[in-house]
């Protein structure tokens, strides 16, 4: 291994149950990973109130400096964080799954929301469990390992839709046995890599980690260009809006530009639906209006939702595949910007299609005030964070009053290269949210 990672392994079983096969596997694998130089944490429920109190004291002590929880973890015995007590629930003659207390979920959310991890590796992430809660709150690359070949009626039948919605966040899935892979594929179709619960598991996991990490975008920009831009003034930019050249908007270009100037916007991206004429008209009037205009288009693909091309010059026809649309944006020297990626009220690419174009995505919209549910924006933040994608925001305004309700504060730029460098250090300014805009 040439690269060392920060990794949290999460088990749903109380850590005291070391006779449990999954816990035994986690203990052996994490010890090996730590010995190989990785920074490893184990998150587990516990029956010990003292262990839970000790872990929470450590989390509180590390607030503001959460790296303390990882530093020193690269040793033969990784740090174990007891995230809370599990409550055994009995129901007549049948034993029901352990209940997950609110305190456990909050502790996991706090920990994973503040500590920087490369991977969250969840074992048996069925609901309700600590593993499932970790998957819900993770902002890292996620691996799900499935060990048992026993049918779980609660997760596969009663709570299937709920469980499946979070399994979409898994970037890789492994199964310990062929029977396990077959069972999981039956209920939750996907590719399951075989990783047996034996001495070679840690090496196989490392290979998966390296493969997934290679898909992340580079954090490094252009230092010389960054230094050049740092001397430029900060401007507010709205990256998503419409004019009356869109079928569902009645805002004239002149009104759009006047309102943008009045709202203090230094630059705007005009992104009409399947049309570029409004953006070209706006750019022609930009100097007089005192607002810089990025020519864009929000293109409806055949079956994979919408994607925005920024800094383009020619209209891209609707109805192409997602890959064809992206290729056309790139042919024009433009930038691929993914709007409202997880808003199920819009036509959006699903997780699988986003991964297929990941290498060509330049930026992703993480805040859109017109989404119906705020969790859609949260999901976009997670996706951008895990793959290190530059984050953007825009009002998606269809009426002039909505302009600037979401904006980016960034150093002034000329052209796509300077724009991307400036975007790396930009600040997202979130305003009011409304479906009316």
Predicted regions and their residues:
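Nucleotide-activated donor-dependent transferases that construct or modify glycoconjugates
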Residues: 2-19
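A conserved catalytic-core segment of Leloir-type glycosyltransferases
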Residues: 2-4, 32-119
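Short amphipathic alpha-helix
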Residues: 21-33, 205
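Short His-centered aromatic/hydrophobic patch
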Residues: 101, 122-127
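Active-site proximal beta-strand in glycosyltransferases
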Residues: 119-121, 132-152, 167, 174
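Membrane-proximal helix-turn-helix segments that form the acceptor-binding/catalytic region
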Residues: 150, 156-173, 187
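Helix-loop-beta element that forms the nucleotide-linked donor phosphate-binding surface
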Residues: 181-197, 203-209
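Charged catalytic cores and adjacent phosphate/nucleic-acid-binding surfaces used
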Residues: 214-239, 243, 247, 253, ...
């Amino acid at each position: 291994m040439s690269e060392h990672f920060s990794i949290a392994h999460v088990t749903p079983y109380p850590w005291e149950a070391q006779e449990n096969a999954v816990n035994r596997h986690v203990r052996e694998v994490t010890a090996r990973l730590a010995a190989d130089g990785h920074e490893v944490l184990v998150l587990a429920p516990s029956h010990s109130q003292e262990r839970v109190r000790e872990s929470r004291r450590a989390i509180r002590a590390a607030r503001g400096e959460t790296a303390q929880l990882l530093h020193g973890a690269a040793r033969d015995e990784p740090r174990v964080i007891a995230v809370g007590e599990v409550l055994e629930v009995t129901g007549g003659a049948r034993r029901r799954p352990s209940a997950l207390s609110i305190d456990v979920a909050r502790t996991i959310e706090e920990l994973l929301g503040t500590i920087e991890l490369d991977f969250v590796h969840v074992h048996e992430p069925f609901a309700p469990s600590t593993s499932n809660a970790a998957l819900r709150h993770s902002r890292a690359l996620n691996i799900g390992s499935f060990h048992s070949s026993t049918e779980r009626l609660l997760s596969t039948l009663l709570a299937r839709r709920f469980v499946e919605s979070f399994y979409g966040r898994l970037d890789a899935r492994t199964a310990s046995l062929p029977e396990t892979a077959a069972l999981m594929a039956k209920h939750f179709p996907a590719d399951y890599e075989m990783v047996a619960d034996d001495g070679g598991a840690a090496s196989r996991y490392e290979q998966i980690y390296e493969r997934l990490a290679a898909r992340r975008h580079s954090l490094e920009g252009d230092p010389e260009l960054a230094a050049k831009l740092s001397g430029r003034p900060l401007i507010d930019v709205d990256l998503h809006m419409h004019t009356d050249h869109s079928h569902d908007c009645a805002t004239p270009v002149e009104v759009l530009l006047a309102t943008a100037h009045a709202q203090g916007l230094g630059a705007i991206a005009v992104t009409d639906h399947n049309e570029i004429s409004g953006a070209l008209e706006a750019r022609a009037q930009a100097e007089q209006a005192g607002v810089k205009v990025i020519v864009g288009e929000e293109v409806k693909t055949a079956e994979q939702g919408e994607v925005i091309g920024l800094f383009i010059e020619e209209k891209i026809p609707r109805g192409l595949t997602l890959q064809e649309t992206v290729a056309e944006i790139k042919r024009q020297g433009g930038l691929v910007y993914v709007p409202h990626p997880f808003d199920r009220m819009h036509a959006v690419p699903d997780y699988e299609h986003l991964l297929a174009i990941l290498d060509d995505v330049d930026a992703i919209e993480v805040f859109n005030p017109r989404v119906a549910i705020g969790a859609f924006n949260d999901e976009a933040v997670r996706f951008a964070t895990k793959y290190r994608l530059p984050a953007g925001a825009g009002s998606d305004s269809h009426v002039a009053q909505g302009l600037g309700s979401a904006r980016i504060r960034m150093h002034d730029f000329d052209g796509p290269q300077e724009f991307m460098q400036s975007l790396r250090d930009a600040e997202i300014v979130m305003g009011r949210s409304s479906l009316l805009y």
